[in-house]
A protein has these predicted regions:
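An N-terminal assembly and electron-transfer interface module characteristic of large anaerobic redox
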Residues: 6-168
């Protein structure tokens, strides 16, 4: 089992040069992540990039709610988006693109002036995931663990929501 191993990038791997990088599931190549055109699970590089883009957009949406009221749809969109990025849930690029668009539209409802602001503050921008992948090993591992944990919780929240149960 790889569950107790601290994740480390293979020597010489620069994530910014790879077509894809995914170490989300137990099928990960050589216990070091999938980095080619497709993962062991069948996820393509384009799908992996769209999942990262969706994650970035979701963080931007969450940041937009820090100082602004969310709408009645915000929680649903965040939960659906997180669920969509879980391992082997959705490898359909069009669905991922549509979800990214929904997240951006929701963010523009919450902070409509940010998309046309001339003095960009960055407070509601999509998050740059390079900040995670290029960071200190321990910080990267911790942030990854938190992200995967939140995605796992979103799976339960998504299924509860489908069954009609919600709770703030």
């Amino acid at each position: 089992s790889n569950a107790n191993k601290k994740y480390q990038l293979p020597k010489g791997v620069n994530l910014m040069d790879k077509q894809m990088f995914c170490f989300q599931c137990e099928q990960t190549a050589s216990c070091s992540g999938c980095t080619g055109n497709a993962g062991v699970c069948g996820k393509t590089a384009s799908t992996a990039k769209l999942q990262d883009e969706l994650t970035s957009a979701l963080i931007g949406l969450a940041k937009s709610c820090e100082n602004n009221p969310k709408t009645e749809n915000t929680d649903r969109i965040i939960i659906e988006g997180l669920f969509t990025t879980i391992t082997n849930v959705n490898f359909n690029d069009e669905t991922l693109k549509n979800m990214i668009d929904r997240v951006h539209k929701e963010k523009n409802i919450i902070v409509p002036d940010c998309s046309v602001c001339k003095a960009k503050c960055g407070n509601t921008d999509d998050y740059d995931l390079n900040n995670i992948w290029s960071g200190n090993d321990d910080i990267r591992s911790l942030k990854s663990l938190i992200l995967f944990g939140i995605r796992g919780m979103a799976a339960y929240a998504y299924h509860a929501m489908i069954l009609g149960y919600t709770d703030d």
